[in-house]
Amino acid sequence: MDREQMDREQMEYVLSGIGPRRQAFNRALTDGLEFMGGWLRRHWLALVNGVLITYIGLAILTPVAFAFGLDGPATAVFHVYRFFCDELPTHSFYIFGYQICLCQRCLAIYTSMLLSGITLAVLRKRREVPSITWWMWVLAMVPMAMDGGTQLFGLRESNVWLRLLTGTVFGVGTALFLLPQIQKSAEDEPLSAPIALQ
């Protein structure tokens, strides 16, 4: 911040009756928010990939926790995942005889999104990765909707390979639709609008 702008800002504070402690707080808060925004713009993909690794990792480690007798924490994690996945026993993988917290399709979706995110992290340093269009993303959803829908209405029973394949197609499609758009948005210059705290 240059001297003239600082003097103008000081004058605005004086005219509005904001004391020196509040001025210091406002400056510290503004600087902190700018730092966090800059950090997120630079490291958003690592954050997304980290969340996916944690989400998939917890789902896979829960049956391991059951096998080692950690029933309390494992049960808690299993119940939390119920909000995000149907966890049908017939549609899930098992480790040590205990069910993974995600069904086969959801596991394929999130794993393929993670692998796509890692691929984007490598490729984005070399060239721009274009986003697919929204209608291509909808097309990526169609096989999963058909497989799940026909099974839901009792027309046929899906199998593990179809669940994995349709989940992977949707996961890759979602990653190719969202991640390049977030990347482009993160590269754009942030709007420099003043933050008014009173």
Label every PLM stretch briefly.
Residues 42-72:
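N-terminal signal-anchor transmembrane alpha helix
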Residues 28-41:
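Cytosolic juxtamembrane amphipathic/interface segments immediately preceding
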Residues 111-116, 168-185:
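Hydrophobic cores of alpha-helical transmembrane segments in multi-pass inner/ER membrane proteins
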Residues 51-59, 112-116, 131-153:
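Small-polar-interrupted transmembrane alpha-helices in polytopic inner-membrane proteins
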Residues 187-198:
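Short, highly charged, low-complexity non-transmembrane loops/tails of multi-pass membrane proteins
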Residues 102-121:
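Hydrophobic alpha-helical transmembrane segments
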Residues 67-102:
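Extracytosolic (periplasmic/ER-lumenal) interhelical loops and adjacent juxtamembrane/interface segments
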